[in-house]
Curated annotation (Swiss-Prot):
Keyword check for Protease: no
GO MF assignments: acetylcholine receptor inhibitor activity; ion channel regulator activity; toxin activity
Protein's UniProt keywords contain Secreted: yes
Annotated function: Binds to muscle nicotinic acetylcholine receptor (nAChR) and inhibit acetylcholine from binding to the receptor, thereby impairing neuromuscular transmission.
The protein's name: Short neurotoxin 1
Length: 61
């Protein structure tokens, strides 16, 4: 599986995730504004963090 791994509005980058079946995109707000984190897997998140998990190559941009 290939997942995007750039932060927030950085130019898109991807990484290969051997053995993974999910990519994720996580969003939250802090004093700097809205933060977006992308990567492999489907981590559990704390309340107040929005997460989208998906199962196809580069689906988490």
């Amino acid at each position: 599986l290939e997942c995007h791994n750039q932060q927030s509005s950085q130019p898109p980058t991807t990484k290969t995730c051997p053995g993974e079946t999910n990519c994720y995109k996580k969003r939250w707000r802090d004093h700097r504004g809205s933060i977006t984190e992308r990567g492999c897997g489907c981590p559990s998140v704390k309340k107040g963090i929005e997460i989208n998990c998906c199962t196809t190559d580069k689906c988490n941009n």
